[in-house]
Amino acid sequence: MSNSPLICHTHLSPNCSRRTHAIDTITIHCMAGDASIEACGNLFADPARRASSNYGIGSDGRIAMYVEENCRSWCSSNSENDDRAITIEVANTQASHPWPCSDAAFAALLDLVTDICWRNGIKRLLWCGDKSLIGQVDKQNMTVHRWFDNKACPGDFLYQRHGQIAAEVNRRLTIMEEAMNTYNTIEELPDWAKPTITKLVDAGVLKGRGGAVDGSGRPADLDLTEDMVRLLVIHDRIGIYGR
């Protein structure tokens, strides 16, 4: 289990426990004030507070880690939620309703949540705004503090943007997944790419990586990414490889 490479500050809190559940949930919180990531870390460093989060985001867009991902933070007033969730505290530019955050903090939040989902195998971020779906991560894998305690957290500003957050994170995950797609045989390719790749294979331009072949005797280890395939097709269509 890894931690986010996006952090620029680490101040590990003693207020945490061993995680016993796989990470499959995201819980976004608000700091209820415009605290820096250093100030938030100092608060969580106090054992008497018995509170922490995995990450924190300041109004300047910087990201800190307070509890490593392999540990459960004490953040959401619910140990079962925190055992499966990555918790993120976001600074507020106004310490009252609707508890807004800066553009820089919101942009950093999108980056961080995308990274967390990608590294932990969360294929899609799901939000219905339905408390009854807590724990049903195939239907909803975002939760909020207000569902577990009498609090406004994460504030209406962020709460009302959970659907937007999910949509943008999913858009980014789709792009990342497509970039990671690899094709080893001509049969696996999308139809629009098969003529070009077949031509290049038959011409000996593409030979595969290790000598494996498919039923037609063509390479079965082409190891072509989506981007590589698109580039080859573009080159073919403008005549670089001849007719």
Please tell me what each predicted stretch does.
Residues 1-82, 153, 157:
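N-terminal catalytic cores of peptidoglycan-degrading enzymes
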Residues 2-9, 18-20, 94-180:
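Basic/polar, cationic surfaces and motifs that engage anionic cell-wall
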Residues 18-20, 47, 76, 80, ...:
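Extracytoplasmic/periplasmic, Sec-exported soluble proteins
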Residues 32, 81-96, 114, 147:
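Cell-envelope and extracellular/periplasmic
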Residues 50-52, 104, 108-115, 164, ...:
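Extracytoplasmic/secreted proteins, especially bacterial periplasmic and envelope-associated proteins
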Residues 68, 114-122, 170, 174, ...:
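Sec-exported extracytoplasmic/periplasmic mature domains
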Residues 176-243:
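Short, solvent-exposed alpha-helical surface patches in non-cytosolic proteins
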